[in-house]
Every structure is written in C-alpha cells, then in structure tokens.
Amino acid sequence: MKKIFLILIANFFVCSLSNSQNSTSSPYSFYGIGSLNFKGTSENRAMGRISVYNDSIHMNFRNPASYTGKNMFSFNNEGRLVKFTVGLGHSETDLTTSDNSSKATNTSFDYLGLNIPMGKFGMGFGLIPHSSVGYKLQSSNQDNLIQYKYSGNGGLNKAFLGFAFQVNNNISIGFDTRYNFGNIENIA
C-alpha cells in the first residue's frame, strides 16, 4: 500500500511540474499549439525513431501492442513484474537575426510511463508532453514609432492509458486512450 501511495505522489509531482514547464525557445512555437514534441522514449530516438520494436526491458509508447508479448519474459533470469520509464531532455538553441543573437537553454521532463503485463494481457499508462510554446518576438514599423512585442509560454500534455492482448507468440494487438490537457498563454 505504501508503494502505491508513493507512486501516486510521484505521479502528482511530475504532473504538476510538467504543466508549468517551458521546454522550447523556438520562434516557430508562435503558431498553433506550439512545437510538437517527440512522442517516444530515448530508445526510440537512438534507433532512428523506430516504433515497432518490442523487448523485455523497454517500454514503447508509440506501439501499444508492445505492452504485452516479450515483455512478459524475464531478462537474465530475473522476473520483471512491471516496466517503469522516465526521461528528461536538454536542448541548447542559438537564435540569430541580422541585428541580434542569443542563446537559449532548456531542460524539461520528456516522459513518464509504467507497463504492467498480466498473462496474455498488458496495460500501460503514463504522461508525455505533446507540445511546447516558448517565444519572445519583437518588431517595429519602418519609422520605429511603434514596437510590437509578442510572447508565449506553456504547452499541452498527454496522459494515456493503453491495453494489449497477445494473440500468439508473434502477434499482439493494442490500443491507447489519451487525454490532452495544459495551458498555452499568448501575449501581444
């Protein structure tokens, strides 16, 4: 019971942090819901953003069928009841115009997930930032009499819950349900 309580508190802490973070400094985040974030894990990125793999030690958000299947087996003869994954990201951006240049550094929460295999079934849930907004733009008219300033911050997050079923040793099927939430603030 204590472990479940600690997991719920950690989940609440990460959710509150992810709702208030700003993980981009891109002027392109001015448009729409902002810059879209990659929806996978560091293993997906390291393999060229592949999303069809399945193994016994990694969680794959991009393929809900991977919540079951090989992840039910043990790795090095140790039983794994659940798979837990969390990721952080760091980026440095150089912004340059004909007049100015600046450097922006961002460190952010990338993902949190838990996968629970249950016989031929599997369940996964977690939290992934969906988009990020973070910009400060300034321009003026030709006479420099009027200055226009635009700024924005925030983003959308995605909470997901997925289920999978292993049809046979080579085929699994799965689906995710997702809920998007967050706040985007644009100031002109």
Task: List each language-model region with its residue ranges.
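Subset of outer-membrane beta-barrel
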Residues: 21-188
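Sec-dependent N-terminal signal peptides
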Residues: 4-13
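Hydrophobic alpha-helical membrane context
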Residues: 14-15, 75
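Sec/Tat signal peptide C-region and signal peptidase I cleavage site
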Residues: 16-20
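Positively charged n-region of N-terminal signal peptides that target proteins for export
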Residues: 1-4, 169
